[in-house]
Amino acid sequence: MNQTPWKFKTFRDLLLKSVAERDLFTGKSLHALYVKSIVASSTYLSNHFVNLYSKCGRLSYARAAFYSTEEPNVFSYNVIVKAYAKDSKIHIARQLFDEIPQPDTVSYNTLISGYADARETFAAMVLFKRMRKLGFEVDGFTLSGLIAACCDRVDLIKQLHCFSVSGGFDSYSSVNNAFVTYYSKGGLLREAVSVFYGMDELRDEVSWNSMIVAYGQHKEGAKALALYKEMIFKGFKIDMFTLASVLNALTSLDHLIGGRQFHGKLIKAGFHQNSHVGSGLIDFYSKCGGCDGMYDSEKVFQEILSPDLVVWNTMISGYSMNEELSEEAVKSFRQMQRIGHRPDDCSFVCVTSACSNLSSPSQCKQIHGLAIKSHIPSNRISVNNALISLYYKSGNLQDARWVFDRMPELNAVSFNCMIKGYAQHGHGTEALLLYQRMLDSGIAPNKITFVAVLSACAHCGKVDEGQEYFNTMKETFKIEPEAEHYSCMIDLLGRAGKLEEAERFIDAMPYKPGSVAWAALLGACRKHKNMALAERAANELMVMQPLAATPYVMLANMYADARKWEEMASVRKSMRGKRIRKKPGCSWIEVKKKKHVFVAEDWSHPMIREVNEYLEEMMKKMKKVGYVMDKKWAMVKEDEAGEGDEEMRLGHHSEKLAVAFGLMSTRDGEELVVVKNLRICGDCHNAIKFMSAVAGREIIVRDNLRFHCFKDGKCSCGDYW
């Protein structure tokens, strides 16, 4: 067919416009005409069809267009390598890269960026060294990609910074912007600030946006907002990325009113329907507004014209951060897939967080299986770390360790998750051994590591070791203790019965003790029956959390235990006067992939009669081997209790009902996992120890503080929780 210059030019312009606008419909129509030879076959045009399909996420079409190119050139290969890397198929991208007859700098940059997206630091560094050895010119794109690939290795980022300065690359805005971003993500805000202010005239919009985000990440929201105002004053263009950065700053300030006002400005400017800005708004409301904020997040979500994967992930994350909405997170995850979005690493991290709150063994396996089927690479550390947390929070410490042991690469988060899992399950010694392995592996601990380690020391009574770790954190690793570390130390001393030392510790804190510290001290006082100190701790908590029932309930329990009925009545009267209500005890267990919920003294479960009959028979067997009901947990004065009232109350606590249902509904020898919304009561704790011995079962109970692993009449908590 004869071809005229105007026909080729028109066709080319339409194709380039389709690529720029990601217009798949027009692009496919043009491709059909191209195949019918309306214009002559051309490597140039074929390359742009590959590029179009890649940008539109149609890898199969991109592959077909590439292999139909008669004479592929280096650009052809670069585009298809990028397409496979973008689709998380980095191994195929590498195979295609190796087939390039004469790769250029762009080829290397493309694959290095692919390795960065895949978090394959080592492979990116090896490729960079090969590139330099073969004499290829390194440019700003090379270094920017390499810095991103080293996002988990601050030591390598520092080395690259030295290389960029010595090589003159510090004059590239893109390189400096990458350093600002990844220094911040690596926890080095000071270095990020130094790079930003050292750029002077090189600073562009990306530089300002990156620095605003950095301040937000480090809870320096006021500085972020000041920088935003300075950016406007200096005449820089404000775009959707800037606005999202400001939302991040407002989120770090927990500034709900300011965020709502900013939302109003976004609506006036017409940015609220943008996916990037919308994602920032959803994140803001979910973090600053709690459960109520999620209603605002849902409204924002509904207004976004075309929610992309990031928006869906943010919505799922918001639900998962609010435990009561975990079911909604799972529903959104499924809905996202139904409309055609394929979950990525972030999707799985968010949904596993929600499933952790639900403690559903069947969902653990489903999510893990789906991650494998979705071709999420086995070396994705973030997904594996999330699976470790999912398994141990669902009571399955063995599978958590199975995932940990098979990870091709471990980082600080991996060790933190596993150490925390051991600590919460009462396996303090194993947690400390793992911490030592972490040090031997050359991975530096962080503040979260020490929270887990100190918690492990508390659970296994290693007071001296705990104090040593606390000192090491400050002196060796230069980590300043935060409120959570002090709370762990108070818990450690309190568990060991060193209440005066714990009180001195709380009084010597460099800042005002928070509710977690006083709650830890109150729990220790309850264990060791120190009424005077308990009253002080409870009163402090009542001031800090005036509507929380926990300090009132714990103090009332202690008064009841000491037979101080008037004081107990006074606490209860105070609760009624302030309209503070204790949450009803609620426990649930999953049997045959179905969740069964039990509430204390509630008869709504369809099998409650059979459960009570089974429990009565179990109680008879337990009493024969030494179980005695601890009636003080009934919280009823002896002279006011009717015959059998105390036994009736204690016998129908939700955790006992859930365990009884599990025993009668599952095979002999099968492990049970029960979740309770409140702290397990002393009598139930003792009763379940006997139930585990009589039934010959391992019973795991997760309350609102920790895990209790009952086996052969003993509990992993050592009877202190």
Curated annotation (Swiss-Prot):
- For region Type E(+) motif, the annotated ranges are 593-623
Q: Name one GO molecular function term.
A: RNA binding
Region annotation (Type DYW motif) maps to 624-721
Q: Where is the region Type E motif?
A: 517-592
Could you tell me which residues the PPR repeats occupy? Answer: 42-72, 73-103, 104-138, 139-169, 172-202, 204-238, 239-273, 274-307, 308-343, 344-378, 380-410, 411-445, 446-476, 482-512
PROSITE patterns given for it? Answer: PPR (PS51375)
Report any one BP term from Gene Ontology. Answer: RNA modification
The residue stretches assigned to a coiled coil in this entry are none
Q: Which UniProt keywords apply?
A: Repeat
Which Pfam families does its entry note? Answer: DYW_deaminase, E_motif, Eplus_motif, PPR, PPR_2
Q: Which domain of life is it from?
A: Eukaryota
Q: Give the matching InterPro entries.
A: DYW_dom (IPR032867), E_motif (IPR046848), Eplus_motif (IPR046849), Pentatricopeptide_rpt (IPR002885), PPR_At4g14850-like_plant (IPR046960), TPR-like_helical_dom_sf (IPR011990)
Family under the similarity heading: Belongs to the PPR family. PCMP-H subfamily.
Q: What is this protein called?
A: Pentatricopeptide repeat-containing protein At3g49710
Q: Which organism is it from?
A: Arabidopsis thaliana
